[in-house]
A protein has these predicted regions:
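Short coil/turn segments at secondary-structure boundaries
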Residues: 23-26, 41-45, 198-203, 440-442, ...
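Glycine/proline-enriched, intrinsically flexible loops and inter-domain linkers
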Residues: 165-167, 322
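Short beta-strand-to-turn element immediately C-terminal to the catalytic PLP-Schiff-base lysine
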Residues: 143-146, 167-168, 391-392
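Low-complexity, highly charged intrinsically disordered N-terminal segments
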Residues: 56-95, 102
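Charged substrate- and nucleic-acid-binding regions of tRNA-handling and nucleotidyl-transfer enzymes
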Residues: 1-75
Length: 484
């Protein structure tokens, strides 16, 4: 019969995550159990009490848990091992007002979710962008400022640091027609889509030299997956595409007005970010108990281990998502034998520490929203057959310096499969001169809102600098489950 043992998972449930400390706790706990000094339940109860208040255990000379208590005290002095207590919160009784752009384009479900979000006790301000639609917790297109020491994993999004990246080449736009097969081949050779997608050869792996990959066990355990997926794209609405960029006079310093060949990509932090989001959203919902309608808006406190771990992980996922795009763009640029004259990129699923117009420091969550501070460049795509836009933020304080992250869904994926037909989609692509590789009916242009109406609704948020017309589009194969 197998002897009873205290597992590492049981110790982690108490909040023990530091590798060295975990080993010490396991050695002491299982030693006491093996020699029948204490029963398992008694050992775990003592360990939980020790973590809550290590001093009495440290002062007890010759005590069984003396060394462990000193480990905890040492970690606390370093600002670690501060557990977030399990707490129950009520929503504010009054619903704060929040500005909405393009109200006529937004479904009632998204509005209801935003109303719930601004009722959180940690909410400071909110805003809803014209591409908004219902999501989990915060609606996609929702912007929420909370107290600066709180962060909501589900308000960042499941695909942490989902982002856009645009490379502009000093090559005439008509090349997209005259060299179509060559450009199509570059996408096939240098992009890889899907949940299990990996790459064999890498362009730049320097990100993996960062010590941050050793900060927490969660990150360490995901490093190999992240490395394997470097330079890949996700599923759903993620894409890499060639198109024509029509640039206005004086829009970008050093680049004359004209029509340029450009490469645009949309994806995030892949399985690395997805696993982080799943792990920490569950912890947040365990630690922060909210009414049912708000449960996905559970937060973590940044002055606790759990909050610090998520903050570190989220920022690393941001760097990783950027590296993914750079890997794709650099490989294609090398094969094309042209360096881009400019590369522009932005997150639209992330949280930033910022200041409101009155000077209040807050945590700004943008879930499917583009940063649009004064002078900040961003990219707002349409769909596979409608234009995207290179924009410059106007710094509108009411929008919390934000704009839409795209056109936004007009219908759900299931509705698209039920109501659209392949002939209609094919005719649209022919009419717009689109070459499409991959994708399915749920990503059809008709499944999205009118990007021109969305842009018109946010003229006071961003200035349009250039229009990007997609022409050669690659997305995940139809068999792939959407990640976005």
């Amino acid at each position: 019969m197998e002897k009873e043992k205290i597992s590492n998972n049981e110790l982690k449930a108490l909040g023990i995550n530091e590798v060295d400390v975990l080993e010490n706790f396991s050695r002491v706990a299982n030693g006491l159990l093996k020699h029948n000094v204490m029963q398992k339940a008694e050992i775990l109860a003592n360990l939980e009490a020790l973590i809550e208040d290590p001093v009495p255990y440290a002062l007890k000379k010759g005590g069984k848990f003396n060394n462990l208590a000193n480990d905890v005290i040492a970690l606390r002095k370093k600002g670690k091992f501060v557990k977030q207590e399990r707490s129950t919160f009520k929503l504010k009784t009054e619903i704060a007002e929040f500005p909405v752009w393009g109200l006529e384009h937004i479904e009632t479900g998204a509005l209801a979710q935003m109303r719930t979000a601004v009722q959180l006790p940690v909410a400071v301000a909110g805003a809803l962008m014209p591409d908004a639609h219902q999501g989990y917790g915060l609606p996609i297109g929702g912007v929420l400022a909370t107290t600066v020491n709180t962060i909501i994993p589900f308000a960042v999004g499941v695909d942490i640091a989902c982002r856009m990246c645009l490379s502009i080449f000093d090559i005439p736009a008509e090349t997209v027609d005259s060299k179509k097969e060559m450009l199509k081949g570059l996408l096939l050779d240098h992009t890889n889509f899907g949940m299990g997608g990996t790459t064999r050869t890498k362009f730049d792996t320097s990100l993996f030299d960062k010590s941050t990959w050793n900060e927490t066990k969660v990150i360490r355990n995901l490093k190999d997956k992240a490395y394997a997926q470097l330079g890949t794209s996700g599923t759903g609405n993620h894409f890499v595409e060639w198109g024509e960029l029509c640039l206005a006079e004086g829009a970008l310093p050093g680049i004359p007005a004209g029509n340029y060949l450009a490469l645009l990509s949309h994806s995030g932090s892949r399985g690395f970010g997805g696993n982080l989001a799943d792990h920490y959203s569950k912890i947040a919902m365990t630690k922060t108990k909210l009414p049912a309608e708000a449960k996905h808006l559970a937060w973590l406190d940044l002055d606790t281990d759990e909050g610090q771990e998520y903050w570190i992980a989220m920022n690393l996922a941001g760097e990783y998502a950027s590296a993914n795009h750079h890997e794709i763009h650099n490989k294609i640029a090398r094969a094309l034998n042209f360096e881009p004259v400019m590369r522009i990129e932005n997150h639209h699923n992330f949280a930033w520490k910022e200041r409101l117009s009155d000077g209040t420091e807050v945590m700004v969550h943008r879930k499917g929203a583009t940063p649009a501070g004064e002078g900040v460049l961003g990219i707002i795509p349409g769909s596979m057959s409608t234009p995207g836009f290179l924009v410059r933020g106007k710094g509108n304080a009411a929008s919390i310096n934000s704009a839409s992250h795209g056109a936004g869904r007009l219908m759900s994926r299931s509705a698209a499969f039920k109501t659209l037909n392949k002939a209609l989609i094919a005719a649209n692509l022919v009419d717009k001169r689109i070459t499409l590789m991959g994708s399915d009916m749920d990503e059809a242009p008709m499944a999205y809102k009118d990007i021109h109406a969305v842009m018109a609704a946010q003229e006071n948020l961003v200035e349009v600098l250039a229009k990007f017309e997609p022409r050669i589009v690659r997305m995940a194969d139809p068999k792939e489950r959407p990640e976005d």
